[in-house]
Regions:
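Bacterial N-terminal signal peptides that target proteins for export
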Residues: 4-21
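Bacterial N-terminal signal peptides
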Residues: 20-30
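Extracytoplasmic substrate-binding proteins
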Residues: 38-40, 46-47, 113-114, 124-202, ...
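A short, structured surface patch at a secondary-structure boundary
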Residues: 55-110, 114-121, 222-225
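Short secondary-structure boundary segments
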Residues: 61, 119-120, 196, 226-229, ...
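His/Asp/Glu-enriched short active-site or ligand-binding loop at hydrolase and phosphoryl-transfer sites
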Residues: 81, 206-229, 249, 278
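Alpha-to-beta junction loops
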Residues: 110-115, 136, 240-245
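A ligand-binding cleft/hinge motif common to bilobed small-molecule-binding domains
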Residues: 121-132, 244-262
Length: 309
């Protein structure tokens, strides 16, 4: 037998460090393979084998977390992203990174029997890596109000909460129709500039849920066009002469207040002359959950206050 050299010790030490990880991954594979499963087609067009009764669900986006809790199935959640802050109960759950920078090792360590992802946000390569460990990933892709409602129904079906999901869907659709009826008789479509960020100035174009919310609420989206999230200079916005400016900050609330004060310097703007600059909760507009209808109603009340007194 040859004597051990330093490289042997290094290799042995490396293997010792890897053993717990390998064992953990093997256990995870065993967990996700037990129980009955069925095939489901997700909103990315993929056929996914999902468990009949998932008990260890990991949410890969704040909107998914909200939907699961809205369905009354929060106990199934074993991991969420660091941005999952609603409802408050979600904040105490184990974190698996941000929805853009997912921590694969943490996800696997939670031994989920189902992960639910969003197509617009979760990196596809990480989703593929999760699936490589035998963990099913069901992807949703809500891009308008209809598909937001469909997403709630599909998640409800995944979690055996279809009755609650149908109730939420019916309520959402009824509230959408009430808004449409109220704004239909106004005969006006005020020019709306919806500002998502302060540096740079970003708005929401035609192919976004926010555009649909503005139009459904009876407004004209000044950022409509081919780009989903176009950038604007201050001069470009001034030239558009918005009648309503709505600001939602992706960062600090102070940014929104500062931006509002900056707009008010331009007294020639119709929105400034008529005191129609508003700051809104970003989560009501960029998360396709039941709360997005709160955003629609808020928007309609801002654009057509005479119809929502």
């Amino acid at each position: 037998m040859r004597p051990l050299n330093m490289s042997d010790y290094a290799n042995f030490a490396t293997r010792r460090k890897l053993y717990p990880i390998v064992i953990m991954l093997m256990l995870a594979l065993v967990v996700v393979k037990t129980g009955e499963s069925r095939l489901a087609r997700d909103q990315a067009g993929r056929t996914v084998s999902v468990p009949d009764n998932p008990l260890r669900v990991v949410s890969l986006a704040p909107s998914i977390t909200e939907i699961v809790f809205a369905l009354g199935e929060g106990d199934r959640l074993k991991g969420v992203t660091q941005h999952c802050d609603f409802p408050p109960e979600a904040q105490s759950l184990p974190k698996i990174g941000s929805y853009v920078h997912l921590d694969l090792e943490r996800i696997v360590a939670l031994k989920p029997d189902l992960c639910i992802a969003v197509r617009d946000g979760n990196p596809r390569n990480v989703v593929t890596e999760i699936e490589a460990f035998g963990i099913p990933v069901y992807t949703v892709d809500p891009r308008n109000l209809d598909t937001a409602v469909d997403t709630i129904l599909e998640v409800g079906q995944l979690l055996n909460a279809i009755t609650k999901a149908q109730h939420l869907a019916n309520e959402m659709r009824a509230r959408i129709e009430r808004v449409k009826v109220r704004v239909a008789g106004t005969g006006r479509h005020p020019r709306v500039f919806f500002q998502l960020g302060t540096a740079p100035i970003v708005s929401a174009g035609t192919n976004t849920v926010i555009h649909e919310l503005i139009v459904t609420a009876g407004g004209q989206n000044l950022a409509e066009g081919t780009a989903s999230y176009p950038l604007f200079s201050m001069e470009q916005v001034l030239a558009l002469q918005p009648e309503v400016i709505i600001i939602t900050s992706m960062t600090k609330e102070l940014d929104s207040e500062q931006m509002s004060a900056e707009w008010r310097q331009y007294e020639g703007l119709p929105a400034v002359r008529n005191n129609r600059i508003f700051i809104v909760d970003a989560d009501l507009f960029d998360r396709p959950t039941p709360r997005i209808i709160n955003g629609l109603e808020t928007l309609a009340g801002i654009i057509h206050p005479e119809s929502f007194r």
